[in-house]
């Protein structure tokens, strides 16, 4: 297929190359079977030029796969294999591989080691105070609001109110959509700083630039090379560690987690006030 004078390569064409590779043939038959099942779930992008695939649409593709963590993980793995092969064949930019690696997966319980340590958070704060780099600002916003990377990109900036310390937004589950997300006192100046430059939701640049800048921030601060998902998990983990404890109902209303048991509790307690959420996030010392 010709595209602007250069030959494009479809997802299906590249996947055929993947199946002929030595690495693919070394995979056990059982695992290959799982991967083929995952590939069948990606039919909607078979004819797409690999180089044209965008983070937001691939995140939506993975989110839309039926099942919990493992089916979605297998689709992400196949996407990674396809894009890595395309990079080797020099038909798309190497930055595309990093985009796939940053696709977020649900449900599999994260552990405390996936949250930023106090030392890492201090390094991020130090970087913000020194550079005021936007990517560092996004990292701090996610750590104190529990927002997903995709939520930053999807956010309607008219629904961001630093003065009122609230963001109305969110994606994914019913619990996550259109929720009141509190803006902690300490990040109000950061939200005010990033909003004037917002072009892609709350973000100033596209996904490729975002992850490139993220990698530079990781290198600059010396913190572990975890994806930006860990900022959200840091918020969730540290809220659970507060003493006296913050109720699960309040935490889930901030984070936007969907949990049937918690949802029933929330219904019995009624709407969780913004003031209750602000009280919780203002107790965080990240």
Question: Where are the predicted features?
Answer:
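N-terminal core-binding DNA-recognition domain of tyrosine site-specific recombinases/integrases
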Residues: 4-12, 16-92, 110, 131, ...
């Amino acid at each position: 297929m010709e595209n602007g004078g250069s030959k494009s390569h479809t997802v299906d064409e590249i996947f055929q190359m993947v199946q002929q590779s030595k690495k693919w043939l070394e995979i056990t038959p059982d695992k290959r079977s799982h991967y083929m099942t995952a590939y069948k779930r990606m039919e909607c992008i078979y004819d797409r030029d690999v180089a044209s695939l965008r983070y937001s649409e691939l995140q939506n593709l993975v989110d839309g796969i039926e099942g919990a963590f493992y089916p979605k993980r297998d689709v992400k793995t196949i996407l990674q294999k396809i894009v890595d092969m395309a990079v080797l064949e020099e038909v798309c930019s190497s930055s595309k591989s990093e985009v796939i690696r940053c696709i977020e997966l649900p449900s599999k319980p994260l552990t405390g080691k996936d949250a930023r340590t106090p030392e890492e958070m201090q390094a991020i704060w130090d970087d913000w105070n020194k550079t005021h780099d936007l990517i560092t600002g996004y990292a701090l916003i996610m750590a104190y609001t529990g927002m997903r990377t995709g939520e930053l990109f999807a956010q309607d900036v008219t629904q961001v109110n630093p003065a009122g310390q609230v963001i109305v937004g969110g994606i994914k589950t019913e619990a996550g959509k259109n929720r009141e997300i509190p803006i902690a006192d300490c990040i109000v100046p950061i939200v005010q700083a990033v909003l004037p430059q917002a072009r892609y939701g709350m973000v100033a640049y596209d996904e490729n630039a975002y992850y490139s800048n993220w990698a530079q921030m990781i290198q600059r601060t010396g913190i572990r090379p975890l994806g930006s998902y860990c900022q959200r998990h840091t918020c969730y983990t540290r809220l659970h560690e507060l003493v006296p404890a913050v109720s699960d109902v309040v935490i889930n209303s901030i984070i936007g987690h969907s949990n049937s048991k918690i949802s029933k509790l929330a219904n019995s307690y009624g709407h969780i006030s913004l003031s209750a959420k602000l009280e919780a996030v203002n107790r965080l010392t990240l």
